């Protein structure tokens, strides 16, 4: 941060150089006697012009000193000089003063030493804001001439030795003391004159006998001096201390000695040199200080609202039209495929009937005794047959197509459902990559589905892959096979040393549906999490082998599907949109669009979701599809990516029997294609029970009771003395026994069931479970002795801390684990996934238009309130009003930005665990939030700016607010990712207030000054003040320098402030992305 000199000292330096050096030229050129001796008006004009010309040449002399000492508040010396001392239009005040002083004007002007002494006195300032000059050679306790009074001045005593260039020695002044000229100001205690700047009104004061003040200034004539009268202005400092010198609001001062009231249709701010015309829709009466431009705010907000409504309606209409066209094309394709399939079936039936008739006729002819009789009998049927054949040929195109298919199954030219082309045009069915239009793609997809259905009916013993292969007549894409074997798998909670899964051995195989059952607390979900590589916070022992190799399951993440127990899907997307997004991001990047559509349509068909495919899934606040349909969508999200291993955590929970069977049939179709399916179920119905291939039953404590084929489960339990009563569902009976509701038959106990299974398969029995083996005495249990020692509280606390650190470390290692990819599947790149995410987030935002409109409405109200209440304060360059703006905009924009990442955390965790790009997810959300970054400053300023009407331009304010919103949005991302919604909202309210308070604290404290540099309100407020300060010139230049010096600002730092805000926003986004990846729960 730039180190500033004292506030007042800075002002002194500025005015010292401006006026001190300027009056050096007066001494070198002015000779007032030329006019006083002759009284010639031409001489007066020459003298006046000569003085003014010398004054204008000082810009070159002053440049180096101003750049060195006042560079923080004066960047354009020429421009600021002209704004303050360009008297080209009227030099009357100078001519009048030359005439009044009879040639001794030069002797009455302040020398360089006096100007320096005057401004150095500002270090001490009285509480009543009256400027006091320190005692000097002319004005002190022992000597006080009348020229020392405010508004008065005296001639220098020694005319010959008087030198305005002398900056060290104060000249003695005792002669010809009189009131100062109008257009000049004469400080109390100095006895010399300085010209007033443009924008000031410096007439001769008039005594108000009632108050005793010399109006319009705030000083009185000395008591007891009857001959003393009021003089001119007495000081020029900032607006707060010398506001009576400034041209009053509602008037303008073309010269420093003339004030004109603003006319109707114009407005004049304080310190104006000319009146400014009001805008057409603004109302400006005479003597108006600021124009009322509320109408333009209303027009702007109406335009923005209309634009947003148009964009929303048009985009919504485009989406609706696109969806309708898609649905129409899809329905037409489905109808076409069904009609074609039905026509094929009718042709097959007719052909079969004809063959049967021909075979019957041949048998009848073989039994005839007379050749003539047989000939007569044969003639009539042949004729009838010919007629029948002619009738069947009437629908010639369809008949030929069906006949061609039956005679040559390998030729698909007669059944080209993909394009609907006529027979004979193409010798081969079009593949997915050759299809481009939506109509062609849907015809291809539905044609394949209908053929698969027909093939499945005719070849019930064939696998689903075989059916697809026959239906497509192409080489079927084979999925990689995943077999998962586990040996002595044990999971132990860290810190508690409690087994949640113990000594589980077995395997789940491709092409089979394995069900995991057990009572509550048996570790079913933990078992699935261990298989899926998601178990953290525990110690794992034993082996998990993938296809016989000790590989991590994460190496097959791209072809592994995991369906969580909760329905983690996007409620503001339709069923089809949820499935389509998963398919796009997780299927092979080289797969054609038509094949992806075919896979999606297969899943929708198999899960029975056709009639709700275009319905929103729904959320807690907004109801959508039913719970059973939502559960099927939850499963379908994983099915569309064609997994080789599909793990489901209680997919049938909450479903009725029909929905459960529909879901399980869909899963069996996947298993027929070679998918390894493992799922947790709770007491399935007998029908569902028979649909499983393998069953894994766990007891409490994570011990295996049974793991094998469903066909052999009853036989096994019967062998150990557990038989299922009549009319009782076997799974229900086994669970009741494990829960302790039903006592098992015979002498066997629940604790012995896992040991019996281990002994049955020859697995080693843990030492502490040997007591449950049959025939062993209770004394030989070998159980470990209980630890009778008790740790102290501090030891327990330390152990808990260590455990939490280990669990956190384990979670971080899990999140950043990078296993070698063995799936042989190349998913879309980050760039392509980013496009998919942008499309998805765009749809979600359009469906949340009411929330967006509410955000804008709140911003409008805030802008109107703050614009009305926080009036422009020229004395402080409106610092306070901008402070309120920073707090309000930061708070409102942060709270609304929380929704970007706090609403769909669970969905992100699921997608990230499935291998979908986190970077694409984050960048797409941030990209769509840029619409708010652009629009919200416009919405707020449409009220605030036109109600407040500051001096700075609308464009400057908008740029600063855009950078501010970009910065605080990044901070909101961090809060949304790390904290719960309620905590994040509290932080979004607290942080702007605290940071603003820190940024506005006294800069003398180095700690607060250092902390303030890291607070975005400090840089935002500086940018606002600088954009406003640039508009203060002329008489305001000292106020500008004073305000910037007090706050430690520099005019050249405006761009720097914007860059810092943008950098803070970028850094916050990097931190937010890091937190999102690091602290996610996979």
Swiss-Prot record:
Annotated Basic and acidic residues bias: 329-348
Residue ranges of the TM segments: 12-32, 292-312, 853-873, 877-897, 958-978, 979-999, 1054-1074
Annotated ATP binding sites: 518-525
Residue span(s) of domain ABC transmembrane type-2: 832-1029
Protein name per Swiss-Prot or TrEMBL: Putative white-brown complex homolog protein 30
Its membrane topology: Multi-pass membrane protein
Annotated InterPro entries: AAA+_ATPase, ABC_transporter-like_ATP-bd, ABC_transporter-like_CS, ABCG_dom, ABCG_transporters, P-loop_NTPase
Subcellular localization, as worded in the UniProt entry: Membrane
Record keywords, A-Z: ATP-binding, Membrane, Nucleotide-binding, Transmembrane, Transmembrane helix, Transport
